[in-house]
């Protein structure tokens, strides 16, 4: 019965995929999905981000996304804020390593007005000295907050170590020591290089394609580039190690040590990306305490083999960061300080078991369960217009097209346990072959007493993890962003 339900849902998806894509004369792409409803979602997606920041532009992405929807050459800051409130206040600008996203959700009749404000903030920001200083102070506070939360700071350290502080290793959050040097001059230089129509996608959900084209032509059709195209540096994975002091303890919370071990993963457009996503779901994981009650992810490997077996583990979860030409895949673990010497071996065992332990090989049942969980997560997320919008905008920015949902579901359905094991072995033995020709070394970041974690490299080597042929003499240079 459930199987029939899945098949019917699959058929409905195929019939309702009404994606359309056009380009304006200036190179700007317009993507639409005319999903019916009383609300529409729209966004502008810029092919920029922290990975493209040169030495003089470090931190500009972070500050620029905080300066969104402020005063412009044609709209004062107060008028901008008041108009946005009247339109519902559901707007945001977020930055990542590979793009900046200006997004909003409004009533259908307000799409034109919101696009006008978006085009103002993207094309004509005033960037007053007062606004800049306010956002610098806000950034300092934000940095302090990040350093108080291991789940936020460790992924940053992971990227910095994995790529030696360059390209994908450039800090997503502006380093504190660079905040004073961020000026309007550098921000405008960054915008001049990356904010161009050829680097931009205008995406709409719930708006007819012809109307979207008309509005985009009206507000963005006369936008012209003033800078030649930028040659973008390929991300080169190097691997590495980093350790920071223990996090402060508040109230009655326990003191914990944290460790993340990762290897170079796959680019987002790699044919095996669906197998890797399924592997992440299969490993799963979570915390020893679940605020929503028991049951979520109980059958994932990191729950059954780690959280249910080792009392000293507070949190254990698989992570996957995928980008246009590289990625990082691994496992994160938090434990009591006394158990830090066992942490590396616990992680190494779980990685090894996915491809080399014949007694714990991946079964048809657990792979099927992971595939169903991945499909349901994908489909439920896409029920939100804002999620559908972001998915469409980022796909067009990266691939030049939107991959149909039924195509993604079909590729997940076709996976076999051997596919998952093959990809796991490729990742965990350091044999990924990406454009940057990265080394197959592990990336290890820790928060706690470094000596307590022991000889991480030898433990990983004992389990056959990582490519140990890399010489110790070509250790990556340390960058002081953190």
UniProtKB/Swiss-Prot annotation:
Protein's recorded name: Mitochondrial-processing peptidase subunit alpha
UniProt xrefs under InterPro entries: Metalloenz_LuxS/M16, MPP/UQCRC_Complex, Pept_M16_N, Pept_M16_Zn_BS, Peptidase_M16_C
GO molecular function: endopeptidase activator activity; metal ion binding; metalloendopeptidase activity
UniProt keyword Transit peptide present: yes
Name of one Pfam family that matches: Peptidase_M16_C
Gene3D superfamilies associated with the record: Metalloenzyme, LuxS/M16 peptidase-like
Function: Substrate recognition and binding subunit of the essential mitochondrial processing protease (MPP), which cleaves the mitochondrial sequence off newly imported precursors proteins.
Complex and partners: Heterodimer of MAS2 (alpha) and MAS1 (beta) subunits, forming the mitochondrial processing protease (MPP) in which MAS2 is involved in substrate recognition and binding and MAS1 is the catalytic subunit.
SUPFAM superfamilies in the record: LuxS/MPP-like metallohydrolase
FT transit peptide: 1-13
Keywords per UniProt: Mitochondrion, Transit peptide
GO CC annotations, alphabetized: mitochondrial matrix; mitochondrial processing peptidase complex; mitochondrion
Family, similarity comment: Belongs to the peptidase M16 family.
The keyword Transit peptide appears for this protein: yes
Location in the cell: Mitochondrion matrix
Additional information: Present with 31400 molecules/cell in log phase SD medium.
GO biological process, any: protein processing involved in protein targeting to mitochondrion
């Amino acid at each position: 019965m459930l199987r029939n339900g899945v098949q019917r849902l699959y058929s409905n998806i195929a019939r309702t995929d009404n994606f359309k894509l056009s380009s304006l004369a200036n190179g700007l792409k317009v993507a639409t999905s005319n999903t019916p409803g009383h609300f529409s979602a729209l966004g502008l997606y810029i092919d920029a981000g922290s990975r493209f920041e040169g030495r003089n532009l470090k931190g500009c992405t972070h500050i620029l996304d905080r300066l969104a929807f402020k005063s412009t050459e044609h709209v004062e800051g107060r008028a901008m804020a008041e108009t946005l409130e009247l339109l519902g206040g559901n707007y945001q600008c977020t930055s990542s390593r590979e793009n900046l996203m200006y997004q909003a959700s409004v009533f259908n009749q307000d799409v034109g007005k919101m696009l006008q404000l978006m085009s103002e903030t993207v094309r004509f920001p005033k960037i007053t000295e007062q606004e800049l200083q306010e956002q610098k102070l806000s950034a300092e506070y934000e940095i302090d907050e990040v350093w108080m939360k291991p789940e936020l700071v460790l992924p940053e350290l992971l990227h910095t170590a994995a790529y030696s502080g360059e390209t994908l290793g450039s800090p997503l959050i502006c380093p504190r020591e660079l905040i004073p040097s961020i000026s309007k001059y550098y921000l405008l230089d960054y915008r001049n290089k990356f904010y161009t129509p050829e680097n931009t996608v205008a995406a709409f959900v719930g708006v007819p394609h012809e109307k979207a084209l008309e509005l985009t032509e009206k507000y963005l059709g006369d936008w012209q580039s003033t800078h030649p195209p930028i040659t973008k540096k390929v991300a080169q994975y190097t691997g590495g190690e980093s350790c920071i002091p223990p996090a402060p303890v508040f109230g009655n919370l326990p003191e914990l040590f944290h460790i993340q071990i990762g290897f170079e993963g796959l680019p987002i457009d790699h044919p095996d990306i669906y197998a890797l996503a399924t592997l992440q779901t299969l490993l799963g994981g979570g915390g020893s305490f679940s605020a929503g009650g028991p049951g979520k992810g109980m059958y994932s490997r990191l729950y059954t083999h780690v959280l249910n077996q080792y009392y000293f583990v507070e949190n254990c979860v698989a992570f996957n960061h995928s980008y246009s030409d590289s990625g990082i895949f691994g496992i994160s673990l938090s434990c009591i300080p006394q158990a830090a010497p066992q942490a590396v071996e616990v992680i190494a065992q779980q990685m090894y078991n996915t491809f080399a332990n014949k007694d714990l090989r991946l079964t048809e049942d657990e792979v099927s369960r992971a595939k169903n969980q991945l499909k349901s997560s994908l489909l439920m997320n896409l029920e939100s217009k804002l999620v559908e919008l972001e998915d469409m905008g980022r796909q067009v920015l990266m691939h030049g097209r939107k991959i149909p949902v039924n195509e993604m579901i079909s590729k997940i359905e076709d996976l076999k346990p051997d596919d998952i094991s093959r990809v796991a072995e490729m990742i965990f033995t350091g044999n990924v072959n990406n454009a940057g020709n990265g080394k197959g070394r592990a990336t290890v970041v820790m928060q706690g007493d470094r000596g307590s974690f022991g000889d991480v490299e030898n433990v990983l080597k004992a389990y056959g993890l990582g490519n140990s042929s890399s010489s110790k003499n070509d250790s990556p240079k340390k960058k002081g962003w953190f």
